[in-house]
Amino acid sequence: MPTITLPDGSQRAFDHAVSVADVAASIGAGLAKATVAGKVDGKLVDACELITHDATLQIITPKDEEGLEIIRHSCAHLVGHAVKQLYPTAKMVIGPVIDEGFYYDIAYERSFTPEDLAAIEKRMQQLIEKDYDVIKKMTPRAEVIDVFKARGEDYKLRLVEDMPDEQAMGLYYHEEYVDMCRGPHVPNTRFLKAFKLTKLSGAYWRGDAKNEQLQRVYGTAWADKKQLAAYIQRIEEAEKRDHRKIGKQLDLFHLQEEAPGMVFWHANGWTVYQVLEQYMRQVQRENGYSEIKTPQVVDRILWERSGHWSNYAENMFTTSSESRDYAVKPMNCPCHVQVFNQGLKSYRDLPLRLAEFGACHRNEPSGALHGIMRVRGFVQDDAHIFCTEDQVKKEAADFIKLTLDVYKDFGFTDVAMKLSTRPAKRVGSEELWDRAEGALADALNESGLEWEYQPGEGAFYGPKIEFTLRDCLGRNWQCGTLQYDPNLPERLDASYIAEDNARKRPVMLHRAILGSFERFIGMLIEHYAGVFPAWLAPTQAVIMNITDKQADFALQVEKSLNGSGFRAKSDLRNEKIGFKIREHTLLKVPYLLVIGDREVETQTVAVRTREGADLGSMPVAQFVELLTHAVSRRGRQESE
């Protein structure tokens, strides 16, 4: 006779075992209809799950985060149902939930086309309209093997082999289609109406390029059609903002097959890049960093000592010369320790902050490359702080403040901070971990802002702080990091003379604010849709004449603005002024200066913005003041 305790503290007693769905029905017909699953004593279970003992129960509906995840997982199974009806010889692999959606990996004799994707989606809609129940059966292992052998589902059999300790497994039946899963899943296909298949891509069995290639069908699913429509609108906006499209439109960069994952920066894009670098150089100089430069290619011996050769070799580009093996550096840390090790260091020299705009190369899989967001060659705003354990808290607190200030300059004010703590497999004493985590937590608390723990997500040698930016589309981008590391100084024999004249190891704090310049510029392009703030715009002002008579004055204005440190160009083409204005508006130039006879006579410029605002005529000196103010704000709003 189980007694069920609900989230509000109320209780319901039953004289027999009762399912989650039964409890929901006892509360109300509306809740019963909306029940996706339940959480019994904190564990997610199917709506059909019987409760035989006193328990706490939360009814899960599509409004709950868990409910939405269950809907997405069930949609992946529905993909399987549709695919097997349309392509009976296809073999289903895995279909997990991902951020805002799901995918299913499939083995088939030919590549799916966009027409196939549309056909699969249409069949899924037809299956949903049948409004059938999804049936779960806990099935003995031997019977599961028989089921998948009979259906020729080779990959499912391999997955069963991966779970030797599982003596019974959950099989979920969508009519004639059967799939294996721990669940839970929706009780009926009526919950799956708000879905859409989004794209096709390639994948490899177990994610290993050495294995056979599979096809991946991606989709998204939501609680209702309104949420789905909002998501589609957001994705369409993201496609308009795709940095690859805008990069071409604004002539910022290009990529080509002969150099996969390497960026060809054009003059406009390189201007943005240089503004970022000069800005970060100034910020670091003002905050006590010394800029250094270390080699690109380093002997294998150093990478062996640092541990990278044994743990990271497959991601490193290597070469040989005169019977010596070398690697192109994938990161800067070991080289920075070499700089620290030159000359005896005293505790009075600490903290020592070494910064480098370090060019790194990593042998990323070609399938993982994406525009300038995921590349093989990139530059980081990388720095390492060598300090004593007692200095960690202050250095971390100063870095947090600096990082948040930098993000504000780029227009990012919604920043999530997370502290990743000790993983199960780790080195170092518990006392060391306590002190390290405590110092970083205290530094985060000093910021006065909200932050959260990520238990078990730290590196094996130390905790770290991560900074995640939310852009104008609500997407999250993990950028900044502060990693506590007592391990590399030990491996590379870094030391300093302490106050008691003993030789001690420094703590090394790895830190980056932007991360990779390439990725950060890609983010900025999409965040601003190419409409860069004046300080970042490749061209800040363009001067246009109406007729040839104003050409000389236009050139004078261009020279004056460039002489004042701005990026200005003149457009003296024999084109109508309306054509010129439209063209430079599409190129997203912040300020458009028009010069006609009246402007020449009064020595003024008629100022328009790319948004179409007419600021009227003004002397060049007044425009310089206006542009100076716009540039000085960087990406901040007027109110900041």
From Swiss-Prot:
Its EC number is 6.1.1.3. Zn(2+) binds at residues 333, 384, 510. Residues 1-61 form the TGS domain. Its main location: cytoplasm. Binds 1 zinc ion per subunit. Its cofactor is Zn(2+). It catalyses: tRNA(Thr) + L-threonine + ATP = L-threonyl-tRNA(Thr) + AMP + diphosphate + H(+). Keywords: Aminoacyl-tRNA synthetase, ATP-binding, Cytoplasm, Ligase, Metal-binding, Nucleotide-binding, Protein biosynthesis, RNA-binding, tRNA-binding, Zinc. It is found in: Cytoplasm. GO terms for biological process: threonyl-tRNA aminoacylation. Residues 242-533 are annotated as: Catalytic. Pfam families: HGTP_anticodon, TGS, tRNA-synt_2b, tRNA_SAD. Transmembrane segments: none annotated. One of its GO terms (molecular function) is tRNA binding. GO terms for cellular component: cytosol. Catalyzes the attachment of threonine to tRNA(Thr) in a two-step reaction: L-threonine is first activated by ATP to form Thr-AMP and then transferred to the acceptor end of tRNA(Thr). Also edits incorrectly charged L-seryl-tRNA(Thr). Homodimer. Belongs to the class-II aminoacyl-tRNA synthetase family. HAMAP family: Thr_tRNA_synth. This is Threonine--tRNA ligase. It comes from Pseudomonas putida (strain W619). The lineage of its organism: Bacteria, Pseudomonadati, Pseudomonadota, Gammaproteobacteria, Pseudomonadales.
